[in-house]
Design a protein with these regions (language model features):
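Accessory beta-strand-rich segments of carbohydrate-active enzymes
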Residues: 28-30, 39-42, 81, 86-194
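Bacterial Sec-dependent N-terminal signal peptides
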Residues: 1-24
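Accessory carbohydrate-binding/adhesion or oligomerization-edge regions at the termini
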Residues: 19-73, 77, 96, 151-155, ...
Length: 195
């Protein structure tokens, strides 16, 4: 009898484990680091959707353009940026969002951009983030083309010589995430604080 009961319980457990789940993910965080375009220098047209970025360098994030430059004591920032160049640069990325996700909310999160970044999605201005050490995010939902191509453009302005007292680099130097949630969800406030 004990053997029959044990076998029945094992069989029931296996059937429950194999049953399809009706659970859906409430929050999906996508690694958004791959396939960005980059160009050093500045031009306001670079924020536009139809701007031709085909000649730009393709790279993956995180990226620091200062460390790629030449070590020269003559740069205006001098020792404050380790004798490496600063300046202005642009990043762009083209991506698609499925039509089926029309009822979802999309947020882009930057874990760190040095410094003074401005962000556009499909030519629409999302905002400016001064400095460069804090995580920040923008809601993309009402500006996305569901079922079509979307273009995000990021202008990074690290042209203020000596903005720091140590080497800080330039660019999107930390991870970027595309976060998809239901409209009704718990807001993520960016961490746990213990005092």
């Amino acid at each position: 009898m004990k053997l029959l009961l044990s076998l029945t319980l094992i069989l029931m457990g296996a059937l429950l484990k194999a049953a399809p789940s009706t659970e859906t993910k409430i929050r999906v965080t996508e690694d958004f680091n791959m396939g960005w375009k980059f160009l050093l220098g500045d031009s306001p047209e670079r924020r536009e959707v139809n701007y031709d970025d085909s000649q730009w360098r393709t790279l993956n994030l995180p990226h620091d353009w200062s460390i790629e430059g030449d070590y020269t004591p003559d740069f205006p920032a001098g020792k404050n940026n380790g004798f490496f160049p600063e300046g202005l640069g642009w990043y762009r990325k083209t991506f698609t969002v499925a039509k089926e996700d029309l009822n979802k909310q999309f947020v882009i999160q930057f874990d760190g951009v040095f410094m003074n970044s401005e962000v556009w999605i499909n030519g629409c201005y999302l905002g400016r983030r001064p400095y460069g050490y804090s995580t920040f995010r923008y809601d993309l939902t009402d500006k996305l083309k569901f079922g079509g191509e979307n273009v995000i453009a990021v202008r990074v302005d690290n042209s203020n010589p000596g903005a720091d007292r140590w080497y800080h680099g330039s660019g999107i130097y930390r991870n970027v995430h595309l976060i998809k949630t239901n409209y009704v969800h718990f807001r993520h406030n960016g961490g746990i604080y213990i005092t």
